[in-house]
Every structure is written in structure tokens, then in C-alpha cells.
Amino acid sequence: MRQYEMLELEWKGAKPEGSWVDIDLAGEFSCDGIITKVKGFYGGDGIYKIRFLPERSGHYTWRIKGIIEEEGEAFCEKAAPAEEGSGKAAFEGTGHGMVRTRGMHFVYEDGSRYTPVGTTVYALAHQPRPLIEQSMETLSRSPYNKLRWCVFPKSFPYNENEPDFYPFEKKEDGSWDVHRPSMAFWEHFEGILRRLEDMGIQSDIILFHPYDRWGFCEFSMEENLVYLDYVLRRLSAFPSVWWSMANEYDMLMKRGMEDWYEMEEFIAANDPYHH
């Protein structure tokens, strides 16, 4: 266990009988009297996980509650000292923590300076595998240390293909079932996220957008919150993640400002690390 690097706990059990999102699994991690509460998630094939991002070094104890009852402890080693420089090569991997603000500037949690040099590849996760690999190779040789990309597929000129995976399974009537995340999709999405992290690239994840022909823009508020709940349970412990509520939010005509405020408040209340 090392400071700023995600800890993952895993258990095998029976498949959930109801929702695959709203599962009764949570953990409390304590160090020096500071307690962080996190929710677990279902990862498919009877696998349940809890992920935790230790932001300080020292002796940790934890208690798991819900469908799993367990206690544990471990010593978290201190991260290596911060190094000078802000180039991408200096920050490959996850050992510097999340990016925070300091005055008018950005810094990693270990105090290292972060100067964002970003680009967008909105439909990165939804392209054919050869194009994904070409894009990743290009990014690995680029100066970019921040990438904006989407959870939902994009319907737009040059992005007209059908993805191999979608974020959810479908119901018998053909509508999306937000309570049944597609594990193939989320494993695929995470694989890209981890590779970007290893390159020293921060992921500015766009949660909503209007470039849709599949019906994701038609979700009710209840469905949106279920979707966000799974995203937060599964991805919040990645130190390289940033949340971007939407691209061109004002083109999502079914959403008023109060809806956006509600979803923002939900994210703030359910992200234990406040990305």
C-alpha cells in the first residue's frame, strides 16, 4: 500500500438479485483519526470490489460493511519526494496524487507543479481497436498531459461507427437498463484510463454530451443518478480522474439548470476525494 496509489479489495460472491449498481457494500478507512467512507461496486462474474485512494501515509485500518463483513489493516508507505518539472515524462504513473489548485495554479498533491497541456479525443473508447491503438501510440509520443474523453458514444461527422460496447445492457423492450452496467464496456473503459495514467495523462471524463443517437440523452433524472452512482463507485479512486459534467450542456434540451445543479450536488456528495 503506497500513498497516492489506489488500493483495491476484492471478494467473490453471488450475483446481485436486483440492481447491479445500488449494492449494499461500503468501507471505512481510518488513518490518524481521519475516516474516509467509500462505496463498493459490482464488477461482474460474482466479483465485488472496494477501491480506496490513500492520500496520506501511515497506519490504516478499515472496516467493510454490508454484504461483506470484514476488517483489515496495512501500513501505507510515503510516496517518493516531489520532483521539479511539469513535463509529462516526469509524472508517468500515479505516485504524485490528484491534481489540486493552489492559488491560480495547479499542483499534484505531493506539491509537484502541474501545467495542463490538453487535447480532446471524445470518442476514444468507442472506436475500432486498431484506431484506439493508433491514438494511444500517438498520445504516448505527444506532449499532452491531459485528455478530455467521453463515457457515452458520440454521433458526429467522423464518429459514425457503432461501438463494440455500450455502458449498459438492454431490457427486453430494447431500452437501456442503467441498473445493469455492461462489464465488458467498463473493463474496456478502465483499461484505457489506466494506460493514460501510466503515460502521465490526466483524464477529464465528460459525463454527458448531446451528440447522441442511442437514447442516452433521453434518460430520466433517476436514471442519470443511477449512472452517476456507478461511475463514482467505480472510478473515484483513480487519482488521474477529473469530472466534466457535460460538453455543450445547453444543447441537452431536456435538462434545465436545476437538473445540472442536482447532478453536481450528487457528485460532490458521493465522491469521497472531491476530484
Task: Report each predicted region and the residues it spans.
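Short amphipathic, basic-aromatic surface patches that mediate peripheral association
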Residues: 9-17
